């Protein structure tokens, strides 16, 4: 009885401490935003332009600092500014909310600092109960295809007066682009079927057309600016999209087209058969598309080669299918080379690279992909992919964060909208998966095809990054889905230490090829969560810079963790383990002067996680052909910096108190002997003597100190 009372008391104490820490961390956004709003906006020195005088001399001309005039959305057509005063910036705002105190000054200084931009928008949030700032919408940089699907610009935008005047002639074009049919301002007819279109939406579209914002970029320079700061607090009753939300819609082709579908496949006859049959049955014969298919096989056994040939010969040539070409050659698996071989042996105007474990579900999917790929400014086009037999998302676009490229919304349910409609409609992303990737042959040739030095991983990402750097906008069509039987093509990389090592090596090649994209993704705000792939898209919730996290001291356990039990119920996710310099500056940073950094999450399945205290574990291992094994019982343990992880709570709604399951650990250079260390975790029950230990395949390399 006494033992139970003591345990109950300890449990309640642990939960109180947990709740107190959780309340502090979950209020971090409101606190962070209020701190920003108190800061003074730094003045920017106006740039100087030069004019050529009568005698050829250069005459300096300091650009004027503009005045900002705030205009409500309801009065956008009432501006009478025939001259287009160069010294004036118009800031258009929704009446449903308020600008921050800094907003006008931030906008003014932005235009001073960026003479190349004539139009800009920014981020916003919502005012909740008690005036608390909640639900921030951290928007992407200019995304033309996202904009045509939804008015993601939201509650405010600004432009130079001169551009407002010059864009007036684009009104009819803007209305047509947004789905309207009329040509009279302020009339119900002006928006046709899109009766909810806002006048401000039409005006913004006019400005974007004037700025050539629906054309291919010059490199990575964007034609419209984006201020990555919340400058507007929206009223809770106001829809952020003002009626034009991300939505499903049917698109028509610009003109009929030919498509070559390239499918790498080996020893998967039944899988490939399902894929081919689904393609034929869901591609309508009146879609304006004719297509051929190339199956590229790098080494199926004799029996499966026969099976391939038999069912390929039985696939009916209907609904636009002209032929299926089976290309066989025994060689090492190289996804890039197989894709390139397929492209060389086909002649379609467009190339669709498709995994053999893809199943097409509904008619119209190829038309939708092609309608985007036909746009001159669009590079690669992908589709939302769901896991089989359910609504779990496998892919909805790639985000490029500090730990590298990740799938957005992976393993989130598609039965509801996530983060302002990200899994709905059409979105510009920095990349899409090669499991389903459509591109024009000309653009494919322009970038030299797939990189054959990346044989297994990141080849599709490199392909998309190159397109982005060339100025194209990549697109993910999240208004429909295909099924992806992922991992049938090859084993999951996280299951084998050797595969993880290969994955890491190819990831380093990727970042060396694109050093300017380390932790840079114009379509995924730096204020959004950058943690594990199987999470929601949510605002970043820990605003403590990694530099401010203290270094952890090591406790040495010569004989291992005594009285502990190794148990798989202690789950560990290791999202980064490497040098702190690599984390901060990318894989090109070769030093280790700042020490080492590890981050991720861990939790105990089926238990109240508020009662557990966790410590990171490292043990020296020896690597061999079978992976890695411990060289002795010695274990090093480290206290962790507890991270707030609401994404884990969203994903694991059946688990108790998993909000604070994140961990971060910094280790000083020279603290550990050089070698390879396996990552693990210790979870100690604060209400009993229970100690749980588990290990993951992740290996941290400690380099010799120089």
Could you describe each region identified by the protein language model?
Residues 2-65, 237-260, 315, 389, ...:
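C-terminal, non-catalytic tails of nucleotide-sugar-dependent glycosyltransferases
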Residues 60-64, 113, 277-290:
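Short, acidic, metal-binding catalytic loop of nucleotide-sugar glycosyltransferases
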Residues 61, 255, 543-706:
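Basic, ligand-binding patches in group-transfer machinery
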Residues 75-84, 329-346:
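Glycine-rich, basic loop-to-helix element that forms the pyrophosphate-binding segment
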Residues 90, 351:
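Short aromatic/hydrophobic "clamp" motif used to bind/position activated sugar donors
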Residues 96-97, 278, 295-308, 331, ...:
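A conserved acidic beta->alpha catalytic loop
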Residues 101-134, 162, 221-222, 358-403:
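Conserved donor NDP-sugar-binding/catalytic core segment of glycosyltransferases
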Residues 163, 176-222, 227, 366-369, ...:
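A short, conserved alpha-helix in the catalytic core of glycosyltransferases
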């Amino acid at each position: 009885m006494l033992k139970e009372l003591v345990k109950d008391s300890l449990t309640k104490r642990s939960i109180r401490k947990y709740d107190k820490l959780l309340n502090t961390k979950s209020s971090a956004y409101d606190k962070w935003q209020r701190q920003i709003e108190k800061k003074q906006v730094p003045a920017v020195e106006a740039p100087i332009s030069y004019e050529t005088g009568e005698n050829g001399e250069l005459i300096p001309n300091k650009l004027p600092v503009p005045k900002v005039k705030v205009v409500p959305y309801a009065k956008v057509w009432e501006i009478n500014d025939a001259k287009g005063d160069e010294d004036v910036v118009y800031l258009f705002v929704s009446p449903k909310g308020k600008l921050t105190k800094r907003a006008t000054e931030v906008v003014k200084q932005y235009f001073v600092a960026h003479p190349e931009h004539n139009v800009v928008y920014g981020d916003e949030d919502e005012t909740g109960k008690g005036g608390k700032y909640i639900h921030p919408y951290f928007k992407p940089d200019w995304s033309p295809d996202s904009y045509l699907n939804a008015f993601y610009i939201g509650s405010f935008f600004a432009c130079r007066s001169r551009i407002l005047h010059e864009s007036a002639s684009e009104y009819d074009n803007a209305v047509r682009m947004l789905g309207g049919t009329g040509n009279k301002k302020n009339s119900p007819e002006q928006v046709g079927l899109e009766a909810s279109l806002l006048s401000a939406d039409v005006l913004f579209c006019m400005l974007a057309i004037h700025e050539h914002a629906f054309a291919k970029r010059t490199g990575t320079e964007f034609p419209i600016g984006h201020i990555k700061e919340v400058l507007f607090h929206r009223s809770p009753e106001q829809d952020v999209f003002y009626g034009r939300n991300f939505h499903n819609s049917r698109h028509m082709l610009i003109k009929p087209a030919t498509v070559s579908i390239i499918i790498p496949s080996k020893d998967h006859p039944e899988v490939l058969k399902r894929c081919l049959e689904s393609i034929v049955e869901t591609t309508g014969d009146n879609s304006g598309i004719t297509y051929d298919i190339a199956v590229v096989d790098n080494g199926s056994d004799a029996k499966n080669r026969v099976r391939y040939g038999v069912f390929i010969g039985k696939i009916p040539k209907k609904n636009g299918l002209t032929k299926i070409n089976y290309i066989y050659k025994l060689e090492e698996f190289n996804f890039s080379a197989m894709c390139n071989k397929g492209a060389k042996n086909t002649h379609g105007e467009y190339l669709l690279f498709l995994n053999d474990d893809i199943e097409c579900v509904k008619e119209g999917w190829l038309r939708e992909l092609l309608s985007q790929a036909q746009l001159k400014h669009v590079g690669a086009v992908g589709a939302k992919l769901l896991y089989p037999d359910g609504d779990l998302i496998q892919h909805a676009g790639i985000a490029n964060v500090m730990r590298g490229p990740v799938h957005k919304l992976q393993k989130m349910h598609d039965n509801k909208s996530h983060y302002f409609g990200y899994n709905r409609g059409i979105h510009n992303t920095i990349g899409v998966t090669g499991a389903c990737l459509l591109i024009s042959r000309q653009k494919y040739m322009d970038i030299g095809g797939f990189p054959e030095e990346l044989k297994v991983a990141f080849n599709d990402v490199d392909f998309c990054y190159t397109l982005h750097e060339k100025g194209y906008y990549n697109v993910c069509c999240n208004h429909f889905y295909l099924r992806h039987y992922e991992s049938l093509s090859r084993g999951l990389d996280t299951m084998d230490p050797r595969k993880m090592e290969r994955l890491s090596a190819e990831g380093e090649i990727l970042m060396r090829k694109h050093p300017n994209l380390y932790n840079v993704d114009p379509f995924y705000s730096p204020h959004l969560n950058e943690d594990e792939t199987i999470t929601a898209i949510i605002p970043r919730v820990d605003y403590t810079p990694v530099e401010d996290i203290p270094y952890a001291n090591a406790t040495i356990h010569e004989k291992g963790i005594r009285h502990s039990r190794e148990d798989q119920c202690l789950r560990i996710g290791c999202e980064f383990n490497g040098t702190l310099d690599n984390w901060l500056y990318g894989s090109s940073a070769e030093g280790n002067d700042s020490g080492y950094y590890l981050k991720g999450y861990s939790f105990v399945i089926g238990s109240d996680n508020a009662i557990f205290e966790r410590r990171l574990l490292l043990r020296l291992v020896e690597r061999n052909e079978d992976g890695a094994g411990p060289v002795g019982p010695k274990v090093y343990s480290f206290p962790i910096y507890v991270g707030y992880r609401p994404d884990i709570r969203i994903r694991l709604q059946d688990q108790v108190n998993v909000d604070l399951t994140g961990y971060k650990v910094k280790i000083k250079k020279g603290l550990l002997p050089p070698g390879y260390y396996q990552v693990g975790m210790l979870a100690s029950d604060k209400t009993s003597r229970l100690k749980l230990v588990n290990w993951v395949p992740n290996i941290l390399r400690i380099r010799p100190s120089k």
